[in-house]
Amino acid sequence: MTRSPLRRLIFGALRRVLYLWVRSETINQSSLTLKLDRSRPVFYALSSPSLTDLAVVDHECTKAGLPRPVLPVAVGPLQEPAGFFYLTPDPDWLGRQDKRGAPPTLERLVAAISQHAEEDTQIIPVSVFWGQTPASESSPWKLLFADSWAVTGRLRRLLSVLILGRKTRVQFSAPIHLRELVDHNKGHERTVRMAQRVMRVHFRNLKTAVIGPDISHRRNLVKGLVHDPLVRQAISDEAEREKIPYAKAEAKALHYGNEIASDYTYTAIRFLEVVLSWFWNKIYDGVKVNHIEQVQGIAPGHEVIYVPCHRSHIDYLLLSYLLFRNGLTPPHIAAGINLNMPVIGGLLRRGGAFFMRRTFKGNPLYTAVFNEYLHTLFTKGFPVEYFVEGGRSRTGRMLQPRTGMLAITLRSFLRSSRTPIVFVPVYIGYERVLEGRTYLGELRGASKKKESIFDIFKVIGALKQRFGQVYVNFGEPIRLAGFLDEQQPGWREQELGPQFRPTWLNETTTRLGETVARHLNEAAAINPVNLVALALLSTSRLALDERALTRVLDLYLALLRQVPYSPHTTLPEGDGQALIKHVLGMDLLAEQKDAMGRILYLDEANAVLMTYYRNNVLHIFALPGLLASFFLSSSRMSRDLLGQYVRALYPYLQAELFLRWTPEQLDEVIDQWLAALVSQGLLRQENDIYMRPAPSSRQFVLLTLLARTITQTLQRFYMATSLLLNSGQHTLSAEELEELCVMMAQRLSILHGLNAPEFFDKTLFRHFIQTLVREGVLQPDGDGKLGYHDKLAELAEGVAKRVLSAELRLSIRQVALHRDEPQENPET
């Protein structure tokens, strides 16, 4: 465009048209002027071809009185038609770049200076940035088109000019004297390459300073994945198995890599930060963060893997937002392939999401590529985030860990442990989860729908509701090397084989998953909705008068302050009255007024929904609730007997609720809780004997409500054991027992009006049966039928009668005894 007078004329007209809209400024003109030798020829090097960039540089040079890039320049006998060149070739319309040789202008300049010792040329790398620094831009639409590390095409450049042109900045780097490079006497080709390398460093350093570091790894990683020995072997195996050429199998591996890899860009992170800042403060009443300082302390020098609990689709974005706001690098996030949809998938990918298929079975090549991708992230120190629960919890409980990602992480660490790995549990608590109504349908028995990010958009119509606050607590970090030292001493010296899959991998991974789940529960953020749900769902009519509810909430707060669950658990501010006011403001409580005051209750829809929020903190109250349960049927008990019964039930409660204490710690914790119950007047103590208050007293009502927090869990335990005992030895398989438990629970929920669909959740029964097997109480025979130890009868009758009412035990036994008989209508 600038190589002839006519082209310069056209270029000038284009520049004038451009500046009808564009406004630009030079950032460091004075420093450039001080270092520029006006007696020497000047050439401007631009990073990549762009007519608009050139027009802006020409405008700024004219304004500053600097040599214009579009005018001819003489270097000794060499006459160049213009004083600029592009360091890299022009991308096509799709943004793809063809690697070619050095710029012809640079080739000619090096040759001319090499032949004429008295000549020199100053090359000024110059960069044009469209829009403000991403760190200071506040418009989400402008951020989408701000400069980034990605290669851009013409269409994106045009949109950048239109949207960002009025905030354009030009930055000149210090001049590079070509004579200094030529005098190294490296020869023509090496000198040209050296000049290119110096300029690339200039451009990279400047871009890093202006828009942040290049943390987009897709272009670097995907091509490198197929060169790993393990992936190459998988490609060869694929070619042989499918009878296809190696090149076709390699292309398949590259396709998998592109499907998986994130396309992390700083600009997208800033865009999401702007949007989410509005979201958290418009939809929610902000985000409260606790214990992030410990993460800031361990992040340097460690590979950090964030393992949050999973309650909502917005969990994906929340953690990245918080880390970015607190000066920590946002992680690369494992996301289901179902979220890789048009527009949304691209934005998530640029925000750090990498996508994984639901199952790797039957596809060893995909498995190898995915494993290598994660290994590369780990060894290069990129922070990573994944959910050990797999999917979102629909019940509010901590789900049983899915160990797939943990196993991949563990194998990667065994392969290379140079970078220490630290797991950081992150508890995310919502006072009202966005997908609550969707979960409500599933809790009521609707089939679980396929996960989709569009679940969020389905609740837009409900955004007029108050959603309260979001709480994010960072839990106690788990250092993987230290964990392995405890579980498998000497693991560093063991022969692990080419696949890094030792015999102890599965068992150790399971324990790691359980440890992560316990640390997540330790970091629970207890909020007003949790406590109100816990209190009202423990009543027979889902209702209390305001003063009674206030007393219950004050009791719970006092107990938790006296015996904190863990140092990472947080409590709500205020007293019981303040908690009620807060929950009423969220329309989660109904009220009825009369002359005696207000009655607060849960309507039918909210009663089911509130089980979700109760379950968030059920583990916190499991042990005090269990202790209180012993006094519903016994007026007094000795400390020794209490300890014996708690120890009998604790393995099953711990397995279901991921309680934090080891069996060795249990006695000390029991004593702490007994002391707290005594101090609050719920028990009396005489030497080694504990006694309940009078049944007609207010304290006994409070003790009863506390006991009912754990009653449904104990009922499920008793159902399973009663069915086994009534069926006899070696008559039921684990699957048959599970199905019978579900049917029995459904019937009992009708008979006793239990408005909690999770009561008959088959996964809870399945896990209880598995725990009985692990504890040696059950043992499958060769046909898979379950035999049981004498301890089962002791557990069912000796312990259960201490914690469940006679009416409940009788009802369960009757249903178990007559399970094969036609059932009568419960109304008759």
UniProtKB/Swiss-Prot annotation:
**UniProt KW keywords:** Acyltransferase, Cell inner membrane, Cell membrane, Lipid biosynthesis, Lipid metabolism, Membrane, Phospholipid biosynthesis, Phospholipid metabolism, Transferase
Its BP terms in the Gene Ontology are: CDP-diacylglycerol biosynthetic process; fatty acid metabolic process
Classify the protein's membrane topology as the record does: Peripheral membrane protein
Q: Which GO terms describe its cellular component?
A: plasma membrane
UniProt key word Iron: no
Which Pfam families did the record assign? Acyltransferase, GPAT_C
Major localization listed first in the record, in broad terms: membrane
Q: Where is this motif: HXXXXD motif?
A: 309-314
Q: Where in the cell is it found?
A: Cell inner membrane
Q: List the disulfide bonds.
A: none
Superkingdom of source: Bacteria
Q: Which GO terms describe its molecular function?
A: glycerol-3-phosphate O-acyltransferase activity
Which pathway does the UniProt entry assign to this protein? Phospholipid metabolism; CDP-diacylglycerol biosynthesis; CDP-diacylglycerol from sn-glycerol 3-phosphate: step 1/3
Which EC number applies?
2.3.1.15
- InterPro entries annotated for this entry? GPAT/DHAPAT, GPAT/DHAPAT_C, GPAT/DHAPAT_LPLAT, GPAT_PlsB, Plipid/glycerol_acylTrfase
Which CDD domains does the UniProt entry name for this protein?
LPLAT_DHAPAT-like
Keyword Lipid metabolism applies:
yes
- What catalytic reaction does the record list? sn-glycerol 3-phosphate + an acyl-CoA = a 1-acyl-sn-glycero-3-phosphate + CoA
**Family per similarity comment:** Belongs to the GPAT/DAPAT family.
Written domain comment of the UniProt record:
The HXXXXD motif is essential for acyltransferase activity and may constitute the binding site for the phosphate moiety of the glycerol-3-phosphate.
Q: What is this protein called?
A: Glycerol-3-phosphate acyltransferase
Q: Which organism is it from?
A: Pseudomonas entomophila (strain L48)
